[in-house]
Regions:
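Non-catalytic terminal and boundary segments that flank Rossmann-like NAD(P)-dependent oxidoreductase
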Residues: 1-18, 64
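N-terminal Rossmann NAD(P)H-binding glycine-rich loop of SDR-like oxidoreductase domains
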Residues: 10, 17-36
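SDR active-site strand-loop-helix element
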Residues: 21, 46, 71-77, 114-120
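Adenosine-cofactor binding site in Rossmann-like domains, unifying the SAM/SAH pocket
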Residues: 41-61
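NAD(P)H-binding glycine-rich loop region in Rossmannoid oxidoreductase-like domains
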Residues: 57-96, 105-108, 125
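Short alpha-helix in the Rossmann-fold core of NAD(P)-dependent oxidoreductases
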Residues: 91-99, 103, 115, 151-152
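Conserved Rossmann-fold NAD(P)-dependent oxidoreductase catalytic core, especially the SDR/UDP-sugar
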Residues: 100-145
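Active-site Tyr-X1-5-Lys
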Residues: 143-156
Length: 156
């Protein structure tokens, strides 16, 4: 549904400042292209070299620099089964703290919209296929991806 003050969906994005964490990643490249196609003219992509999104001071500085109306949070510590097994605490802590602190700072600053992206790794180990959203909370994720999956699930 288009809000009564918008003539087209592009009107929504035209004057909004958008911050896309993880915008330099695989999914981020598609999100940036979609935003451009929809008329978003003010898009800020924080670079990992400039902002540690687990550090509260860096998060505050990022929000100060970007001044976003909308945040699309795609950034993550991601890896395969081996990486999750080798560093489970890092996968859980970094992904959870990054998301929670970004979300909390957005709330404190009155950001209009915050979008946190989930993952199929958040679904229970024995979820029927095709996956349905109603199944998300019906069990524990598959153990090899649980640290990442649980952290992302907690942001939904």
């Amino acid at each position: 549904m288009i809000h009564s003050t918008w003539n087209t969906p592009a009107d929504f994005w035209k004057d909004r400042r958008v911050c896309v964490t993880g915008g330099a990643g695989f999914l981020g490249s598609f999100v940036l292209a979609a935003l451009q196609q929809r008329g978003a003219a003010h898009v800020f992509v924080p670079k990992i070299e400039d902002y540690d999104l687990v550090n509260p001071q860096d998060i505050q500085r990022m929000y100060h620099d970007a001044r976003p109306d909308v945040v699309i949070h795609l950034a993550a510590l991601a890896g395969g089964i081996g990486a999750n097994r080798a560093r489970p605490a890092d996968f859980f802590y970094i992904n959870l703290m990054m998301g929670v602190q970004l979300m909390h700072e957005a709330w404190k600053r009155g950001v209009e919209k915050f979008v946190a992206i989930g993952t199929v790794c958040a679904y229970p180990k024995f979820t029927p296929i095709p996956f349905r959203e109603e199944e998300l909370w019906n069990g524990y994720p598959e153990e090899t991806n649980a640290p990442y999956g649980l952290a992302k699930k907690m942001l939904l």
